[in-house]
Structure formats: C-alpha cells, structure tokens
Amino acid sequence: MATFPHFGTAAIHVGQEPEQWDMNQVVPPISLSSTYKQDNPGEPKGHDYSRAGNPTRDVLQKNLAALEDAKHCQVFSSGLAATSAIINLLKYGDHIVCSDDVYGGTQRYIRRVAVPNHGLEVDSVDLTDVQNLEKAIKPNTKMVWFESPSNPLLKVVDIAAVVQTAKKANPEIVVVVDNTFMSPYFQRPISLGADVVVHSITKYINGHSDVVMGAVITDNDEFQQHLFFMQLAVGAVPSPFDCFLVNRGLKTLHIRMRAHYENALAVAKYLEANDRIESVLYPALPSHPQHEVHEKQTKGMSGMISFYLKGELQESRAFLSALKVFTLAESLGGYESLAELPSIMTHASVPAETRIVLGITDNLIRISVGIEDLDDLVADLDQALKIAIPKV
C-alpha cells in the first residue's frame, strides 16, 4: 500500500517536542487553566485566555496541519462548528455550489441557517461531472463545497478537476473539501489544489468514539486569520481534555486506517458476491463508477461502505436489528463497527423527495467497518442478511 512518506513518524512527533514543556514531558500535558498570568499588563507570555488559545490545543493543531501537509489548522468544538466558521466567511448575496450528496447536517446548516438567516444562495449539483459545476457557477459564486467520497452514497469527485474548473471561472472562488471519510492518511485535498479542508475529528481522526470536534485546515494566511477571529468571537472552542484525547488518537491513525481498509475491502467483496444485495458502493472496488478517479487521487480507502438490500424498509429494519457485532448507531470512524439506515437516521433531515432523487432509499444501508476480527464481521453480516431476507 503506497502511503504519504513519513506519515506515522509525523503523527507521533510533530508538535510533541518535550523541550517545549518545563519538565520535558514526552506526552504533552493537559493544560486546564482558563487564564494565564501576564508579566506586565498586555504582555502575555504565550496565551492570555483559553478561548483565544491553549497549549494543548496548539499541539493538536500543529500535528493536524502537518498531517494534511498544510500551514494552518484551527480546531473547533464540533464538525458543524467548523462548517459554520467557514461559511461565515461569505457575505449576504454570495452563492455556494454544493455537491448534492453531503452529510445531512451540512445540508441542514446551509439550507436552514445560512440561506434564510444570512442571505446566501445555494445550488446543489452532482459534482462527479464537472460540466455540472461549469453550468452552476454564477457571477456571485464564492465557494464550492463537497465531500469525496460523499456521505452516504460514496460518490467520488475529481478534486483537481473541480479546482481547475472553479478557478478558471473565478480565481477567488474558495474550494472546500470535507475529508472526513478519508482522513489525511489516505487523501490530501490541499495537495490537489483545494483551498480548505474540513474534518469532523469525531470520526477517523479521533477514532475512539469519545470526542466531538471539528477542524479547518488551510494554506491561506488570510483565511486562517478569519478562522481565528471567528472562533474568538463566537467561542466554539474544544476542551483541552478533548484535544488531549484526539492528539493521542492521532498516534495510531496510520495503523487504524490500514486495518479499516483491509477489513472493509474484504467486507465489500463479500457483499458484492451476496445474492441478498442489489449493489455495493465502495470506491476501492473496480465496479464503483468513479473507481479510476478514486485510485488517482487517494492512497487507499476507509471503512465506509454503503449497499442496497434486496428489499424495502421492513427488510432493512430486520437486518439492522439482527446484527450482533455491528452496532446500530449513527456516526462512523471508530474502532468499533457501526451500521445505520440513512433515510431515517443520519439523512432524515434531507427532504424526502430529494432523498429519492439521490438514491437514499429505505433499502440503503451504511456501515462503518471497524477493526474487529474480519471473520466475525463477515459472519455477523451473513447471519443478519439471512434473517432479514430468508429466501433469494
């Protein structure tokens, strides 16, 4: 498996230098202080107040920026807090082109907060074809927002092609890529020309399902200044303890992602060969419609798989209820395997007519394949499928 050079070494060492601490701690300490003594009025030693900055947060931000091969990282109290900070860069009347298949929470924020409350315009299009982007761009377009792969349909967008198309129309258009499904271990959108990368740290980066956090990563100095000010003004900061947990989780990110990929590829192949399954959506499979694009711009794939059962809502409910190793729950990216029904769970806020057009139907199952023993995962899926669909 070809990976970015020195990733594991960077994850373990960048920003973690013992010499930055008074006692040369090998593991960065948790700085819980909300305020800091100043030697003279208006002359703080490093930080003045923890909403503006915190040593434990600094360590995490340096590490994440390095892993995306970028200059700046700002971490927020959630992925949607990070999303709102990015979109707040825009002004009244500005236009966003958004991919039609994104996380339901992102859609909800843009359509029910940013558009009615802040006067933004949005068009949702299928960005797997850049001609759709060309047609959607307007004189007031200021941002293009997408995920690759997307949630939950695992559509792959050619990041470099989108960047080229957007910048040709207007060099000032900001291209934002949500890299949550891939992590920087498998994909680095900034190296492909994206201006901004956003992560729900809650997922693969933390990897232990015990933190809610988001990150915005960029090479753009002006954009970073905006992010810092927005966080200072709004106060969407993560706790030092959560920053410590994520920083610890990063030390095994490269190991975890390899295990997720190995398990998920085997599970996807099993599902594709199963008579109870209509189709499987996993970009690492040659059958995936954007498989070649995925291979071109990534170093592998995470544990995210979506698939269509041969059935309807009744069969989906029966399948999910019969699982024993997979847990019926929202979220993804932890060491444990999860399964969910997007139409009534993660994407329930998407209008029903939109879900139908996109293909988020009641027989679409999304699974986050964890790092348990592969044989146990396959056996669990097999027994649940046989219960849900007894005859084929």
Curated annotation (Swiss-Prot):
Any one GO cellular component localisation term in the record: cytoplasm
Superkingdom of origin organism: Eukaryota
Keywords: Amino-acid biosynthesis, Cysteine biosynthesis, Cytoplasm, Lyase, Pyridoxal phosphate
Record's keyword annotation contains Cytoplasm: yes
Spans annotated as Disordered: 32-55
Reaction catalysis annotation: L,L-cystathionine + H2O = 2-oxobutanoate + L-cysteine + NH4(+)
GO MF entry, a single one: cystathionine gamma-lyase activity
TM regions (residue ranges): none
Comp. bias intervals (Basic and acidic residues): 40-50
The protein's Enzyme Commission number: 4.4.1.1
Locations listed in the record: Cytoplasm
SUPFAM superfamilies associated with the record: PLP-dependent transferases
Residues modified as N6-(pyridoxal phosphate)lysine: K203
PROSITE patterns attached to this UniProt entry: CYS_MET_METAB_PP
UniProt pathway annotation: Amino-acid biosynthesis; L-cysteine biosynthesis; L-cysteine from L-homocysteine and L-serine: step 2/2
Binding site residues for substrate: R51, Y103, R108, E330
The family this protein is said to belong to: Belongs to the trans-sulfuration enzymes family.
Record's protein name: Putative cystathionine gamma-lyase 2
Organism: Caenorhabditis elegans
